Swiss-Prot record:
Present in the aqueous fluid surrounding olfactory sensory dendrites and are thought to aid in the capture and transport of hydrophobic odorants into and through this fluid. This is General odorant-binding protein 2. It comes from Heliothis virescens (Tobacco budworm moth). Belongs to the PBP/GOBP family. Keywords: Disulfide bond, Olfaction, Sensory transduction, Signal, Transport.
Amino acid sequence: MTSKSCLLLVAMVTLTTSVMGTAEVMSHVTAHFGKALEECREESGLSAEVLEEFQHFWREDFEVVHRELGCAIICMSNKFSLLQDDSRMHHVNMHDYVKSFPNGHVLSEKLVELIHNCEKKYDTMTDDCDRVVKVAACFKVDAKAAGIAPEVTMIEAVMEKY
């Protein structure tokens, strides 16, 4: 094996391990965050059907479009002190929350960056629930593109821990 081939192999293994690590951490974050969903169902006006669908947030066919989802995400985020008073992400608290999971440090910077970039896109929207559902949809697309979105099976595997 030439030195160039060896370097390429090391780079590919490192990148794959990094992406797999962040997706695994994201599965923990998703499972833990999702535990607040039932508590927030009534407060946000989430129907039983949308509640059931929301359990599959990361699936390709799940569309993040319902205003009530935005309201539920606000409620859930407030349970963990992840938002400021204006319903925008509290960067320090979000970093700390993500870092509280095993290997969370490998994900926190990227997750906060992606959410912040999505928040900037919809900053002029005045309805918090509408804005947050748009931010969530944007984040889902960007997280998948960045390779940090977890597989549904990964989330199911860690659900019992939370």
